[in-house]
Regions:
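Bulky hydrophobic segments
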Residues: 1-108, 113, 124-362
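Long, hydrophobic, well-ordered secondary-structure blocks that form the structural core
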Residues: 117-120
């Protein structure tokens, strides 16, 4: 099977496009409250005036946000090469138009033609990048070899890889510590808060959450692999990628005084403990790994219930070197995905374990 034919049969781009589209919809419509009809006489947003106040930064964020969506749609299988750009552009425009229309019923949101244009431009940019990548035989072959050699075959493997990619992508929020699911309660630049004594309970809970998350995600990855001999390298690559994404995001998005907060002492201890637990768990039978992964993932969501200060912590906006309105969308989306991901991943693993003859890695 050639790289092109294998890529064409893969459902991974479709799953990524669907998951990313849901993420865009959530970010565009949250907090899903106070819906009301527009005042009488309000024109449809396409025929209304442009927003009186806008920044180049917000426009750039919209372009960047929709570029991955266009990229994934353009790579969806069974679309003729000549039609990929048109299909991606139509999908991005339709999604953006639907969401901007829905925003007309949310007083906290502003439906804007400028947003639609920026979103469409981002979709087009992503689709063009996908077409350029698809023309590179070397790049297509490299992706196909990794996908086929390392991970489970078929639709199940594609969906698992898509879920793993979504988890890695949301590590881009440095306001949420490494392998955590809630915001860092200490990431505030208020001197009064900075001088307060450390909450031991919050530190313990944060460490336990990170340990559970690392154990669960590591086992999730191990269960996606074809052969056990790939587990060590794959887990190290995953942890290294998460460290890289979180560290770069902290350097770019946080103020210098808050750079270290993405890896506080409690979390670093939890990551170390989770790594040791994972080392002992990768040799267990796969049915046991499924149960242990689900317990660990769900525990990473339930553990913050023990400390309301951690559970209801708000996004630490003062620690970000980013004062634009898109920051609320960014924090809300990444936080929601991190809370929902363990549930979705656990459901996927139980569905995988229920398939007849899913077998053991070689």
């Amino acid at each position: 099977m050639t790289a092109q034919s294998a890529t064409a049969r893969s459902h991974l781009p479709l799953f990524l496009a669907l998951l990313y589209g849901v993420a865009i919809a959530y970010a565009s419509l949250q907090p899903f409250a106070n819906w009301m009809a527009p005042p009488p006489g309000t024109p449809f947003f396409l025929f209304g005036p442009l927003a009186p106040r806008w920044t180049r930064f917000d426009v750039a964020i919209n372009v960047i946000a929709y570029a991955p969506f266009g990229f994934f749609v353009a790579l969806v299988p069974r679309i003729r090469p000549r039609a990929r750009l048109v299909v991606a552009l139509a999908a991005g425009t339709a999604l953006s138009t639907a969401l901007e229309t829905a925003q007309m019923f949310l007083p906290s949101r502003d439906a804007s033609t400028l947003d639609l244009l920026a979103n469409t431009a981002g979709t087009t940019l992503g689709a063009l990048l996908a077409l350029a990548a698809a023309r590179s035989a070397r790049a297509a072959r490299a992706v196909t070899v990794v996908r086929q050699r390392w991970f489970l075959p078929g639709t199940v493997g594609d969906l698992g890889v898509a879920l793993l990619a979504i988890w890695l992508a949301v590590q881009v929020n440095p306001g949420i510590p490494l392998f955590a699911t809630t915001f860092d309660t200490d990431l505030q630049l208020d001197p009064a808060l900075a001088s307060a004594p450390d909450d031991v309970a919050a530190i313990v809970v944060a460490g336990a959450t990170s340990a559970f998350q690392l154990l669960g995600v590591g086992l999730f990855l191990a269960l996606l692999l074809r052969e056990r001999r790939y587990i060590g390298g794959a887990v190290l690559a995953l942890i290294g990628s998460a460290l890289f994404v979180k560290g770069v995001a902290a350097a770019l998005l946080l103020k210098p005084a808050a750079w270290h907060h993405w890896l506080p002492p409690g979390v670093s201890d939890g990551v170390a403990a989770g790594a040791l637990l994972l080392l002992g768990a990768i040799g267990l039978p796969r049915p046991v790994q499924v149960a242990l992964a689900a317990i660990a993932l769900l525990s990473s969501v339930l553990t913050p219930l023990l400390t309301p200060d951690v559970l209801f912590a708000h996004a630490p906006l003062s620690g970000f070197a980013w004062s634009y309105g898109q920051l609320l969308n960014f924090n809300g989306l990444t936080h929601a995905v991190l809370l929902a991901w363990p549930v979705a991943a656990s459901a996927f693993l139980f569905a995988l374990a229920g398939r007849p003859g899913w077998g053991e890695p070689s």
